[in-house]
Regions:
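N-terminal secretory signal peptides that target proteins for export/translocation
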Residues: 1-2
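Beta-propeller-forming repeat regions
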Residues: 20-395
Length: 395
């Protein structure tokens, strides 16, 4: 069943001020392959530092990076290739078998169209040894669709972590893989389709309905189903049943990535980037089945929007916005941040990347140098800057 949550649409016509600034310092984590496509984060060795995994789409590699700590974070990071698969679009950490060794799941598009697990070695000393990793496919996903994104999530409250998956055409879908009693038996993972899609960009778990159960918030980029969508979890006892589909808005845009956070000012709960270069802010209205949608045009001299995040860049207590871009050709910037002035119709543009790089991806916000402000981690895949981070100059 689909429930339509009609958005009240407001368009804020504004132009962020353009200021000539130096870009932030860029540090390379890895540029050893081709087509780095998204960074996902977890502390896999329990040292308190965030580690990363990335799929290199053109290079056909899935790699893991162990954080060397703030003193060495500006150098190349210790890394391991955990598997070689064609066209990996996404890679994410998940301890699927619960043995304490954090595995990696890769989602592949192209002609591969399969989801793989890369089993981590149980001995922590072997984590950076590529020959100690084992790669295997989930049979239920083989040659089904172009898999784009994976969200590890305990959907049904049993047998550990399940996998929520999203794809693009052909056969675009969102669904979940149910973990069996022995997660190592990949043939026993069961597929449950939830939603017919066009092109899935984001999958995020968030309790948007307030019932204590994480739902799945997604952006669907293409086709008649495009927009911002909530799949309402029916409860762990009914997880294999029907999930209500709530359409929150954005159908008139090619929506890209999203971020969710309750922000006192300007009052948005969800922010979404769009290919047509608008940031969409969503807030709950007085009516329970209506959301207010606000559109903010992109800053000048940037590519087309890809990922967006809330971040207090300058530590003034107000949440700013940062976004990455594709198609940042020539003198266009691929990363900029918009300073909050306290007025939601007035955002001030600031530089992050400068003109170097063309196609950037998912943004992760972490204090890698431990100086008290948030740095920005991302990938760039056209000029092969690779897996990189930008050092926040605030401190």
């Amino acid at each position: 069943m689909t429930q339509i949550l009609t958005p009240l649409v407001l368009v804020l016509f504004l132009s962020a001020s353009l200021v000539a600034e130096d870009p932030w310092k860029r540090h390379t984590i890895d540029n050893s392959s081709r087509g780095a496509d998204g960074v996902r984060v977890a502390d896999v060795n329990g040292d308190g530092h965030p580690d990363f995994t990335t799929g290199w789409e053109e290079g056909g590699k899935v790699r893991v990076y162990l954080n060397p700590g703030p003193e060495k974070a500006k150098e190349l990071w210790p890394a391991v290739t955990v598997g070689n698969v064609k066209s990996p679009e996404d890679a994410v950490f998940a301890d699927l078998d619960g043995d304490g060794a954090v595995d990696v799941v890769s989602s592949c598009e192209g002609s591969t169209q399969t989801v793989f697990v890369h089993w981590a070695p149980q001995n922590a000393d072997d984590y950076l040894k590529p020959d100690k990793w084992e790669t295997a496919a989930f049979p239920a996903t083989k040659k089904k669709t172009r898999w784009m994104f994976c969200l590890p999530m305990d959907v049904d409250g049993k047998n550990g972590i399940d996998l929520v998956l999203g794809s693009k055409q052909p056969n675009a879908v969102v669904g979940w893989l149910e973990s069996p009693s022995d997660p190592r038996k990949l043939g026993e993972w069961k597929w449950h389709p939830l939603y017919e899609a066009g092109w899935i960009m984001s999958l995020m778990k968030v309790d948007l309905t307030g019932d204590g159960q994480d739902d799945v918030l997604l952006t669907d980029r293409k086709g008649p189903t495009r927009g911002l969508v909530l799949l309402e979890h029916p409860g762990q006892d009914n997880a294999t049943g029907e999930w209500l589909t709530h359409r929150l808005g954005g159908e008139e845009h090619e929506v890209m990535f999203l971020d969710h956070r309750k922000v006192p000012a300007p009052g948005w709960e969800i922010v979404v980037s769009t290919k047509d270069n608008n940031l969409l802010g969503f807030s709950r209205s007085d009516k329970p089945q209506q959301w207010t949608q606000v559109a903010i045009p992109a800053a000048k001299n940037t590519g087309t929007m890809k990922s967006v995040r809330w971040i207090d860049v300058d530590l003034d207590g107000r949440l700013d916005l940062i976004y990455s871009c594709e198609n940042a050709n020539g003198k266009l910037s691929g990363l900029v941040w918009l300073e909050s002035t306290g007025d939601p119709t007035n955002w001030k543009r600031h530089e992050v990347s400068g003109p170097e790089g063309i196609k950037f991806d998912l943004l992760q916000l972490l204090d890698l140098d431990h100086d008290g402000d948030l740095d920005v981690v991302t990938c760039e895949e056209r000029t092969n800057l690779g897996v990189i981070w930008y050092e926040n100059p605030t401190r």
